Amino acid sequence: MAGAAPEGSQFDARQYDSKMTELLNAEGQDFFTSYDEVYHSFDAMGLKENLLRGIYAYGFEKPSAIQQRGIVPFCKGLDVIQQAQSGTGKTATFCSGILQQLDYELLDCQALVLAPTRELAQQIEKVMRALGDYLGVKVHACVGGTSVREDQRILSSGVHVVVGTPGRVFDMLRRQSLRPDHIKMFVLDEADEMLSRGFKDQIYDIFQLLPPKIQVGVFSATMPPEALEITRKFMNKPVRILVKRDELTLEGIKQFYVNVDKEEWKLETLCDLYETLAITQSVIFVNTRRKVDWLTDKMRSRDHTVSATHGDMDQNTRDIIMREFRSGSSRVLITTDLLARGIDVQQVSLVINYDLPTQPENYLHRIGRSGRFGRKGVSINFVTSDDERMLSDIQRFYNVVIEELPANVADLL
């Protein structure tokens, strides 16, 4: 199962590499700026004292690989394209760069961050607020499913940073509730998700309304060639910090598969795992909203305490469920890919792919929920005969070997 992808596999790793190489070399080095400096401590980065206080209070001790290379060029006002896997402090990289450059005397929006989902936008807002706690930063998340009038009230009272989803942000700009005059930093987070799906036109529309001289940061866990191509229109000689696919191993997360003969037997396998393992907190991924509801009912009928969230639920319900999960009062969360990127919970030790993702790229976003910030994590993939091709695709895409679940899995958690 760990070998090459079977004939007819839907993912062509060689084609991906050749497209990426062609794209990156298409304009030689004229398109990019090189920036090779690495900073092994936050203290060496020349950051404001009160920003350092916020970074250390948040729990960071030393910078991750992407932070060592990515914070300073952003602080210097350079355009940047940065790729790093989930759980490596990517969000804190651009938050630090923004917080370092804000004029706190000016209570106008100076930085705009776009994210693909409400949950992720709200997570970024929390990180920005926490890191900027000693700086007095004012941040607001503009997302769908919330009161337009409340957004307008908060924006009119003055904020330094707006984080949001493209639809609501464009609406606020169109209504002139969000004024772009002082915006000097524009960040796209999870650019792969936004640029390769339906948000492309909205991002263009937003960009047209921003001042001509603006710093642009593009951050993502995966960077498809199509996403890089679009950034050319926005960016001026960006610094490129790319992690090759063979480095996207999600260090510290042990990855296993369990062979399940029939789809119907996955439920028994799942219940067996929960009865034998002592799990702090875990996330279970399935591929459809209907299956979230079905699996939640089945687990509860067997006396397992689980909570569930998916895109059909209203925003208030989703917020309450995520709050309970973050606080630890709920220990098992069942969800879909849609919400994978907004789940940032420190104590998650196990991710179970009840269904394998339909795209190799989404595997990274799912299993990056475990082992956050250097903690140990385990991911377990349920694999039927129909899933073998996708498992091979995932292994080739990330250049990893996913081994069969050992008998002593309890020792790994």
From Swiss-Prot:
**Domain of life of the organism in this record?**
Eukaryota
Q: Which reaction does it catalyse?
A: ATP + H2O = ADP + phosphate + H(+)
- Molecular function in Gene Ontology: ATP binding; ATP hydrolysis activity; RNA binding; RNA helicase activity; translation initiation factor activity
- Residue positions annotated to bind ATP are A84, Q85, S86, G87, T88, G89, K90, T91
Cross-referenced Pfam families: DEAD (PF00270), Helicase_C (PF00271)
UniProt KW keywords: ATP-binding, Helicase, Hydrolase, Initiation factor, Nucleotide-binding, Protein biosynthesis, RNA-binding
Which intervals of this chain are the motif Q motif?
A: 40-68
SS bonds (residue pairs): none
| Sequence motif DEAD box, location on chain | 189-192
GO cellular component terms?
cytoplasmic stress granule
GO biological process terms on file: cytoplasmic translational initiation
Q: Which Gene3D superfamilies match?
A: P-loop containing nucleotide triphosphate hydrolases (3.40.50.300)
Q: What is its EC number?
A: 3.6.4.13
Q: What does this protein do?
A: ATP-dependent RNA helicase which is a subunit of the eIF4F complex involved in cap recognition and is required for mRNA binding to ribosome. In the current model of translation initiation, eIF4A unwinds RNA secondary structures in the 5'-UTR of mRNAs which is necessary to allow efficient binding of the small ribosomal subunit, and subsequent scanning for the initiator codon.
Q: Which family does the UniProt entry place this protein in?
A: Belongs to the DEAD box helicase family. eIF4A subfamily.
Can you state the subunit structure given in the record? eIF4F is a multi-subunit complex, the composition of which varies with external and internal environmental conditions. It is composed of at least EIF4A, EIF4E and EIF4G.
Protein name in UniProt: Eukaryotic initiation factor 4A-9
